[in-house]
């Protein structure tokens, strides 16, 4: 036999789960902020580097592993070849990361770095973050991608 306290506890739990589900579904269909910058070139957060991303083709495909070129230069325009670069990212509105673990696999020279293992498994607003450590210092770049 259920007591009034256990019935209230069940009702609270069901209400909390329903509210969480409703909020999650609202996030899935929410639009990105209007001021999102989708450009493929930018200055790092601390101003130490300028960078550009170049996907393999004209468009960024969904559901396929990709290779990108990350071009890095100092704020003064000198190519950055000897950099340690960490790659991360995800979907801000969905609260999850990338489905793969992309990484910079080698320096190509003249400031270019090969990024392998990038994959986007659904349409929407994604961010790709690069944390760069080189002679000029450590700094971060964030690129917005829309599929």
Predicted regions and their residues:
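Sec-dependent bacterial lipoprotein signal peptides
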Residues: 1-26
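Intrinsically disordered, low-complexity terminal tails/loops enriched in metal-binding residues
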Residues: 25-147
């Amino acid at each position: 036999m259920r007591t009034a306290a256990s019935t209230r506890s069940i009702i609270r739990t069901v209400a909390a789960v329903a509210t969480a589900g409703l909020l999650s579904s609202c996030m899935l269909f929410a639009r990105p902020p209007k001021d999102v910058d989708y450009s493929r070139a930018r200055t790092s957060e601390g101003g130490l580097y300028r960078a550009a991303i170049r996907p393999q083709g004209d468009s960024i495909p969904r559901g396929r592993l990709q290779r990108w070129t990350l071009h890095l230069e100092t704020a003064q325009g000198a190519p950055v070849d000897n950099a340690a670069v960490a790659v991360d990212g995800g979907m801000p509105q969905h609260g999850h990361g990338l489905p793969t673990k992309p990484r910079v696999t080698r320096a190509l020279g003249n400031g270019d770095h090969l990024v392998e293992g990038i994959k986007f498994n659904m349409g929407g607003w994604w961010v790709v973050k690069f944390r760069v450590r080189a002679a000029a210092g450590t700094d971060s770049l964030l690129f917005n991608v829309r599929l």
